Amino acid sequence: MNLRAGRLNSGMEDEAAEFTSSLTFDHHIFEADIECNMAHTRMLAHEGIIPEEVAAKIIDALESLREEGIEALDMDPSVEDIHMAVENYVTARIGEEAGFMHTGKSRNDQVATDLRLALRERIRTISRELLDFIDSISDLALDHTETVMVGYTHLQHAQPTTLGHHLMAYASSLRRDYERLQDTLKRVDQNPLGSAAMTTTSFPINRELTTRLLGFSDYMKNSMDAVSARDFIAETVFDLSMLAVNLSRISEEMILWSTHEFGIVEIPDEFSSTSSIMPQKKNPDVAEIARAKTSTVQGELVTILGIMKALPYTYNRDLQEVTPHLWRAVDTVLSMIRVVRGMLLGIRVNRNRALELAGANFATATDLADIIVRERGIPFRVAHRIVGRLVTRAIEDGLAPGDVDSVYLDEVSLEVTGRKLELDPELVEKALDPLENVRMRRIPGGPAPEMVRVAVEEMKSFIESERK
């Protein structure tokens, strides 16, 4: 079918046709376009708008196209888009009666519907992958409830924690990413079909029926908004950008922890590379590429917002340029989930090195201050000053945390406050021991092994409820 034959006197210039065609990325909505056309055709027949026998022919042709696949379409740029390519296929199969398929429908509401149908499935796929990843992280955390390591602030030793506790931080952030996607899905799952070009149609169509046929939760209440809204795309790509950031943070820590200086983990060979000149090298290339690809996903979001920012209502062809950025973001993040999951679940943990670092640089100092407060009723700020001075003196004296005892603490307290603390030596030793330090933090959300197990149990319950 020549769409231009009525209003225009010539075909589009070849380069202009290629420049404006969306066919290079319309394969993402091929299945959705068939589904949309089928639902609309069934509705037209149900409402008596087109003959039932014509509708049957159209649906048979669409079924044949679904079986043959997108390769059956003429994808020449002059066709413009997937909608016309599909219509041309049906026309070639059944003749001019194929034109009934477009009754009361515009490419404006059709593409908006296709995008929502296709994106709905992509979000569900990503969500399933994300739940699986969170589940796997939770399992890994259970294996490391007593793998003591140092936690960092400002990338400086801060306080002892466990790898299990740290892994559940990953799981918690990814759970929020999952929840954001579920919330966005509510706004994606709205039916624009029936809005036509922008003001619906004079044909007595049934929007409730197409909404049911396409499995949408509801239809959109304003036809102008329905054909021009792409905020659901921007919202989705923001969610994906945030998810990519969290995956990038995991990747960054794997890069750091696998260095000789940290030496906490070894990344699997399957997710590493080597150097073309330095034979000793084992490089965390997968983690580095994941980190870099996060920026490309963020770039897709910025581009989408830039395209949308000044468009008058309703439809503008500019909106066509939004969709490739959506699909690139979707494909990139889905790939990131899979490779980061494989990398993280395959790490080999050096428990001895992790424990060594936890006890090497006074990461237990906070608990020593807490014990002073509890045992002697001293304000925390005074205890903070005592322990801060103790750390400075110990470093100057070349002492490790394990070398500090209650006598040494009394010397420092005398210097700072003019009086000794005279704490039980066992209390001081316990406060400075990384494992004991962790075990004392039996607060919900904390690193004590039993608290991590509770966190895992709660996460598992959440995952189970979401999978139902």
Swiss-Prot record:
Keywords: Amino-acid biosynthesis, Arginine biosynthesis, Cytoplasm, Lyase. Disulfide bonds: none annotated. This is Argininosuccinate lyase. It is found in: Cytoplasm. Pfam families: ASL_C2 (PF14698), Lyase_1 (PF00206). It comes from Methanothermobacter thermautotrophicus (strain ATCC 29096 / DSM 1053 / JCM 10044 / NBRC 100330 / Delta H) (Methanobacterium thermoautotrophicum). Belongs to the lyase 1 family. Argininosuccinate lyase subfamily. Pathway: Amino-acid biosynthesis; L-arginine biosynthesis; L-arginine from L-ornithine and carbamoyl phosphate: step 3/3. It is an enzyme of class 4 (lyase). It comes from the Archaea. The lineage of its organism: Archaea, Methanobacteriati, Methanobacteriota, Methanomada group, Methanobacteria. One of its GO terms (molecular function) is argininosuccinate lyase activity. One of its GO terms (cellular component) is cytosol. Its EC number is 4.3.2.1. GO terms for biological process: arginine biosynthetic process via ornithine; L-arginine biosynthetic process. It catalyses: 2-(N(omega)-L-arginino)succinate = fumarate + L-arginine.
